[in-house]
Amino acid sequence: MKRCGLLGEKLGHSYSPAIHAELADYEYRLYEVAPEKLGEFLTSGGFDGMNVTIPYKKAVIPYCAELSPIAQKLQSVNVLVRRKDGTLYGDNADAYGFAGMVRASGIQIDGKKTLVLGSGGASSTVHAVLEEMGARSVTIISRKGEDNYNNLDRHADAEVIVNTTPVGMYPNCGVSPVDLSLFPKLEGVLDIVYNPARTAFVLQAEKLGIPYMSGLYMLVAQAKRTAEVFENRDIPDSETERIWKKLSLEMQNIVLVGMPGSGKSTVAARLAEKLDRIALDSDAEVEEKNGATCAQLIEKYGEAEFRKLESEAIAALGKRSGAVIATGGGCVTREENYDLLHQNGIILFI
């Protein structure tokens, strides 16, 4: 069996092993490697294929005997293959993945004024793809460049915005790199972040009625391309769509809201059992964190303060994935709770 995986400095939780398990029959593990150990890891011969993530997409290039044309152009490698002679071949599947994400979103790029938020490695990849798709202009927005977050008014006529920054990514959910209401001509929003499923950036797009897409499709599409390189065979494009839909459903929380006494906790427990998911309860979370019952907390602090404690609990639960969440009857009285619960979930009233 081929030995493959994901190389990075700090990886934490990753969906990549689950995606690759759907695509092919090879071992796929996570490899956290310190910068001073990178050369030793790459030359040891201990793997057949490897995805590469930050901060090593450029650092691995000197160890490659050959680069694909796209990797050479972007000077960014996120796929390594060990050839029969032991040398490494470097490729880039991120461009393929982002292009697939754009096509799946239905957002038109040809002839549009586009903004790319962020100036890191992903930014250059996105820039190249947008140009190839015929964007009228592509402007990089960075913190310190000529075009930055302090002069966004220069680009109020932007039609498509792509976020390539980690702003809003788990666990620092709930923040957005820009206020989309500043762009009255906006026609599409793309965010390469995939956890949470809906960042604050795309949640605002949803509220404004602007078409959007999050980064999970890109992750699956680039994994499909990676598997093709690892296996030296074609994989149908339909596999990307299938795996994306499957993961989207599995990752999505089912959130129950309703009047007190409507049976949310009971229904959540039964649903979780039927669907083989974990059942979570915001009231139970509040009580566990504060060492008292909800009734006692309301009596001690008043309802307004209790609702703040409830929102803190909901913020923690809303970051989870693949759960059934029962909420307190009054959670709908605080508007902020909607985004906290919807970022990873579908909300059902019972």
Task: Kindly label every feature range from the protein language model.
Residues 2-105, 196-198, 208, 217-220:
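Phosphate/diphosphate ligand-binding glycine-rich loop within oxidoreductases
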Residues 284-342:
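ATP-dependent small-molecule kinase phosphotransfer cores
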Residues 133-149, 283-285, 289-290:
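NAD(P)-binding Rossmann-fold cofactor-contacting core
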Residues 265:
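Walker A/P-loop
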Residues 192-252:
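Adenosine-phosphate binding glycine-rich loop
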Residues 341-350:
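Conserved phosphate-donor/acceptor-positioning beta-strand/loop module used by diverse small-molecule
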Residues 147-213, 331-338:
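Rossmann-like adenosine-cofactor binding region
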Residues 8, 92-95, 102, 107, ...:
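Glycine-rich adenosine-cofactor-binding loop
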